[in-house]
């Protein structure tokens, strides 16, 4: 059976297949660059694992308090060495990226301190953590003030107003690397380093925290290499590569990580407790494979950008821009387009492919959201997934794919659904 016939069995028409193949053939040089980045990052991870003498004993389970968990302690040192930080928390008790960010914020801020976002509004779920949207237990309720400096119209930092916003009470600056549910560009590690240097020149003792979700292993360096005091991420995104069943990490300066640990558990216990309950093997294996899986997700994102840009849709990043994370935003312009795209992604999944996603009132968001994720791990966005808020400009955010081939199928399937509903013409 030839490849085209196999795709036909999966519901891909000849026209969609041919269109996709033409696009794929034009991307060989771009894909080779991703291969080189992945190889570099793979060697970084292997070196850190060998340096810390990872052994079979590290895969054992701990229970109860989790004292002296060799696997947990070694894994945290592997992360710290890979990311070039003094310390790192890597815990299954951290439920998601938002939780990791909240732990870091509450652990390092005190009543009367000010939190500054110099990159505009943070991700929707962080609004209630901070208190931008009123919520019980927010930072605002605990007396932490929040300031925000929006980006300039071209998506760059407003240095003039950032300088005005930083004052003697500014304790922590939070920088979201990825675009979130926005159509602004995601930031490069170099840009983040320049922003951190600018802020620290004004106030050297300010803590700079980077939300690194969706950004790990996209480049050969991380925000921790350019001055970030804290770097936060989720294990059901890039560093877990679809194998980690749960978890998050907080890496950075030893004092900042320790402060976060007292919020994760409690004062006096900090990093010393936290049973791993048998997940260590998956956390290690996920981190080991993460550079390769991230590479496949990047190829899928670039493929999506090229497909939809050729059809006239605004895409961020565009088809030729450098990649700073694995997310591809496509502005579809209509609710019908957003729904069709997500339903196509779902139909390409190995799990729950028969399910039809519909918009729903998702906790933490101010509008209905549609999500497609036929994943092995619930909510895993390093696996093939797409989502978007049901409000103008009806942009979809596509990411993931444990293999490039699966990401490719997902994009072709999304296009097929839009063609079938007469939302696009090839």
Question: Residue ranges of each PLM-predicted region?
Answer:
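N-terminal small-domain helix-loop-helix segment of the aminotransferase-like
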Residues: 63-71
